[in-house]
Amino acid sequence: MNEINYVHFVNEKLQSPFAPTWNYFIAEKLLSNIQCTRLKNYLLSKQQEVFAIKNNLDDCGTGLGNETTTARSGSYNIFTWDQPDINILKKEIASMCNNYHMRVTGKKISKFGLAGWMNIMKKGDRIELHNHAFSNDSYLSGNFTVSSNDTKTVYNNPFSQYTKEKVLVKMVEDGVNDPSYYSSKNIDGKLTLFPSYIPHFTTEHKSDNYRITIAFDLRYE
């Protein structure tokens, strides 16, 4: 998957004037130009620096708790760190954002902001159903898998709220194919982009090794 793969979610033909509509894409691409092991080691070396942040802790609905790098996401921006793989990732995100924006709107985007953080998860951790934004200026969000072992990120239709989260998790773990969600296997080097309002969660991390991802928000300017 060296090219961008677009997974399209669109409503069926409306039978009622009050039926909901949706039309969005989940975009994915495998990046072979990032050394994930080197990046993993670098991020782990920065963990204590991030943990030194003690104010404004908020895990943003992920369920990971305040003793995490995730809960400090509002107090640091990973893309200000000068490291070769992060610098490459910034360029790849910019390229993918431009491609996505052009595909959906037919126009180029001239400028956008980028803020990111790292999620370092231990055995037994799971990111709960949440989204990143739904305001009138919300734009795109994404994640990059640095190191993972048999986990999935699941992107849920924002109108599909009839199924409880624990049921959804079991459906995904049992391999149930349901059109209300898209289950994406977390592969080292995978970059994913999606509208910020899309609810998403992960399956449980069952490995003794860390699960490490970089999550980010793009700001429309």
Where on the chain are the PLM-derived regions?
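Ligand-binding loop in jelly-roll beta-barrel domains
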Residues: 199-213
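Conserved double-stranded beta-helix
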Residues: 72, 77-152
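Short beta-strand micro-motifs in enzyme catalytic cores
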Residues: 23-25, 140, 210-214
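Non-heme Fe(II)/2-oxoglutarate
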Residues: 2-105
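Double-stranded beta-helix
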Residues: 154, 217-221
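Catalytic core of non-heme Fe(II) oxygenases with the double-stranded beta-helix
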Residues: 119-193, 210
